């Protein structure tokens, strides 16, 4: 078999007159009265191959048997297309290949999906036949971008003198957040490894070990409820460094991301990125990962609401809640009563009891609650919300968390429906100064907002024992277009501070020692100040490639129920395998 001389998408007018050897898949076959045209495809693109009896009867006879997705080896001569046959939408659109020989390397059944960017297959079919789905150019281009992003990051970190170090996949189960995936040990009867949710503890131990600068393209595993932007196994760019301040870490990440954007996407973004404190993000956008490509910020009306004539507002404030609103500029005529009812049902998903609304008309406020506001109150509302005729005002009165969640989500929905978002923009944002701990009323305990190893502000360390809810974290999230790209922090590196953190999280001294004794002991041997960040590679590629689902950036992803339709994993195992592990199943019968 002759060697391939050209990739299909790389045959251009410079090759006219040359004999070429091409190998690829049949994208399309057209029989035009004695001539057969085939679009031959490989990962670089498509080239048109012509089978003409005057050139080779033998090749034409073979071409008559060929169907879509056959794998071919074609030998032929490159010629220029006629003036009326030029296709400037293709890189190879000015030439075609006159076939002299063709060899069928492999035949193909009719595929269950159309191998094209626009396919009619459902996602389940695409996942079941993922190897066919991956043939679509849009999928290859996504993974080419993933490769380019990863290569750029590796090259950048190499110039910054970071070492790539692999950390264990089989590790210890620790209560860090989501449920662990557990792996039974055959050698240690009744004991289990856990797959890592992140390399957090190991990268900190590498800092104890004096490596100073570490990174890893790390596989991580979390047994959690899935959604469009979550997978049970995912990849993060894991970075840790000693002796750097928060500003130095953020500056380095900005330089890395601007290089990624330029090299992988061809987009120039300016640094430094804007910074916003967590409290401000929640107050202004109702989100800890705000999409700043459009305005429509939340306005706090609690002070006004406390003295207005609308009881729903006043009672919310009196009970410790708040009232906030968003002004959808010029949207009054675009939303009917039925449309607003749909918005009301939407905010109820986020815990809101309802959605109050007003439309601003030339002669004043109109809507179900307009009668509760006199002229003076109406003017205050209009001025506070900077409202003018044609605006739609939307209000939620509830607990602070419910107000933020519901209006934050509503803001994003309206931004999309009103086409306020410039999809060509890439708006990076740092969200800083996070709360260190969050209180869970159901569990009646505090949980770490990021993880238990986050360093509090120095002046807040004592608050861990007196007022944990007031302690602030030296933590930072990188946000892009309303998506959390990654999170990081400066880390605790002193045993006494780490023990205070564990105590605030409800660990007894014995539990902390049992779970994290190795880390606490390490902190007694001269641990350097350190910090880092973990960036979600899958999510970054999703945003840069313009995809809407993480599954499109992972070669062989899982479904929303964490199953693989291709291999049918998870699956039962043989009884002998269970016996070898001394395991017995207690499977609940379906009712």
From Swiss-Prot:
Looking at the UniProt record, the site noted as Important for tRNA non-discrimination sits at: 84
Recorded hits in SUPFAM superfamilies, A to Z, give:
Class II aaRS and biotin synthetases (SSF55681), GAD domain-like (SSF55261), Nucleic acid-binding proteins (SSF50249)
The region called Aspartate is annotated at: 200-203
Q: Which InterPro entries match?
A: Aa-tRNA-synt_II, aa-tRNA-synth_II, aa-tRNA-synth_II/BPL/LPL, Asp-tRNA-ligase_1, Asp-tRNA-ligase_1_N, Asp/Asn-tRNA-synth_IIb, AspRS_core, GAD-like_sf
Q: Where in the cell is it found?
A: Cytoplasm
A Gene Ontology MF term for this entry?
A: transferase activity
- Matches recorded under CDD domains: AspRS_core, EcAspRS_like_N
Give the chief site where it resides: cytoplasm
Q: What class of enzyme is it?
A: ligase
Q: Which residues bind ATP?
A: 222-224, 231, 484, 536-539
The Gene Ontology biological process annotation of the record reads: aspartyl-tRNA aminoacylation
Mention any one GO cellular component term assigned to this protein in its UniProt record.
cytoplasm
- Binding positions for L-aspartate per the UniProt entry: 176, 222, 450, 491
**Keywords, sorted A to Z:** Aminoacyl-tRNA synthetase, ATP-binding, Cytoplasm, Ligase, Nucleotide-binding, Protein biosynthesis
One family name in Pfam for this protein: tRNA-synt_2
The superkingdom of the source organism is Bacteria
Q: What is its EC number?
A: 6.1.1.23
Oligomeric form and interacting partners: Homodimer.
Q: What does this protein do?
A: Aspartyl-tRNA synthetase with relaxed tRNA specificity since it is able to aspartylate not only its cognate tRNA(Asp) but also tRNA(Asn). Reaction proceeds in two steps: L-aspartate is first activated by ATP to form Asp-AMP and then transferred to the acceptor end of tRNA(Asp/Asn).
Checking PANTHER family in the record gives: ASPARTATE--TRNA LIGASE, MITOCHONDRIAL, ASPARTYL/LYSYL-TRNA SYNTHETASE
Family assignment from sequence similarity:
Belongs to the class-II aminoacyl-tRNA synthetase family. Type 1 subfamily.
Record protein name field? Aspartate--tRNA(Asp/Asn) ligase
């Amino acid at each position: 078999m002759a060697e391939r001389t050209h990739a299909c998408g790389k045959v251009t007018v410079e090759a006219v007159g040359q004999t070429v050897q091409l190998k690829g898949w049949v994208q399309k076959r057209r029989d035009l009265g004695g001539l057969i045209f085939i679009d031959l495809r490989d990962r670089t693109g498509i080239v048109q191959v012509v089978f003409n009896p005057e050139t080779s009867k033998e090749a034409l006879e073979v071409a008559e048997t060929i169907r879509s997705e056959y794998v071919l080896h074609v030998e032929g001569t490159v010629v220029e297309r006629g003036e009326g046959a030029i296709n400037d939408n293709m890189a190879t659109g000015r030439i075609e290949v006159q076939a002299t020989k063709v060899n069928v390397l492999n035949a193909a059944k009719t595929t269950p999906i159309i191998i094209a960017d626009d396919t009619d297959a459902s996602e389940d079919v695409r996942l079941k036949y993922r190897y066919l789905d991956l043939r679509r150019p849009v999928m290859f281009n996504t993974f080419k971008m993933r490769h380019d992003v990863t290569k750029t990051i590796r090259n950048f970190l190499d110039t910054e003198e970071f070492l790539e170090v692999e950390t264990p996949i089989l590790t210890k189960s620790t209560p860090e957040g989501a449920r662990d995936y557990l792996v039974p040990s055959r050698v240690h009867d009744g004991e289990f490894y856990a797959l890592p949710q992140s390399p957090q503890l190991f990268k900190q131990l590498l800092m104890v070990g004096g490596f100073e600068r570490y990174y890893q393209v790390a596989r991580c595993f979390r047994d959690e409820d899935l959604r469009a932007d979550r997978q049970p196994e995912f990849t993060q760019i894991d970075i840790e460094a000693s002796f750097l301040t928060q500003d130095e870490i953020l500056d380095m990440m900005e330089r890395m991301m601007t290089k990624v954007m330029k090299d992988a996407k061809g987009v120039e973004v300016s640094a430094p990125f804007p910074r916003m404190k967590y409290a401000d993000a929640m107050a202004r956008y109702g989100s800890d990962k705000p999409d700043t490509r459009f305005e429509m910020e939340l306005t706090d009306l609690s002070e006004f609401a406390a003295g207005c004539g609308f009881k729903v507002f006043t009672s919310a404030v009196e009970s410790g809640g708040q009232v906030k609103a968003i002004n959808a500029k010029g949207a009054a005529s675009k939303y009917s009563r039925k449309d607003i009812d749909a918005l009301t049902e939407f905010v109820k998903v986020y815990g809101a009891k309802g959605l109050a609304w007003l439309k601003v008309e030339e002669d004043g406020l109109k809507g179900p609650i307009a009668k509760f506001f006199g002229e003076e109150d109406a003017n205050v509302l209009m001025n506070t919300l900077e409202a003018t005729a044609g605006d739609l005002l939307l209000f939620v009165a509830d607990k602070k968390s419910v107000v933020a969640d519901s209006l934050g989500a509503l803001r994003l929905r309206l931004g999309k429906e009103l086409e306020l978002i410039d999809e060509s923009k890439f708006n990076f944002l740092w969200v800083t100064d996070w709360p260190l701990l969050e209180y869970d009323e159901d569990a009646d305990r505090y949980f770490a907002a990021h993880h238990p190893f986050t360093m509090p502000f120095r002046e807040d360390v004592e608050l861990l024992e007196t007022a944990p809810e007031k302690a602030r974290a030296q933590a930072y999230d990188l946000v892009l277009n309303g998506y959390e790209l990654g999170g990081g922090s400066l880390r605790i590196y002193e045993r006494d501070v780490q023990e205070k953190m564990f105590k605030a999280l409800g660990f007894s001294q014995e539990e902390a020692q049992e779970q994290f004794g190795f880390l606490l002991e390490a902190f007694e041997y001269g641990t350097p100040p350190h910090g880092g960040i973990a960036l979600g590679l899958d999510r970054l590629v999703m945003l840069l490639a313009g995809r809407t689902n993480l599954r499109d950036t992972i070669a062989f992803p899982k479904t929303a129920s964490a199953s693989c339709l291709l291999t049918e994993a998870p699956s039962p195992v043989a009884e002998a395998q269970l016996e070898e592990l001394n395991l017995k199943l207690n499977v609940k019968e379906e009712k």
